[in-house]
Amino acid sequence: HTAAADGSVKADLSVAKEMGGPGKPGTTTPEHLFAAGYAACFGGALDFVGKSHKKDASKARITCNVSIGPRELGGFGLAVKMHVEDKSIPQAELEALVKEAHEKICPYSHATRGNVDVQLEVVGG
């Protein structure tokens, strides 16, 4: 079980199947929580960047998939696939906004850079 210090988030946890755990139904994993936090943070960063370029990216759908697996040096590592979709913004413009949010604004992107493989998939209009 885990909970935020202020009680705003509570979750029953299980160990992911990839790590030899049961992956129990009705529970979550630390990877799920990381994915939710990263997606939420990235959404805020994208909205911030959009506003600075007079674009409304507040309705972008952001899906983050975090996987876990063995590392070459031992132990386990994470990999992230971030899917960003907003058909109201042209593809090239959305790609530029996502790139700026990822490279300059998002704290999760800063924290993972050089440590976690992050792949961005962008679908604009």
Predicted regions, residues:
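Extended beta-strand/beta-hairpin segments
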Residues: 1-36, 43-125
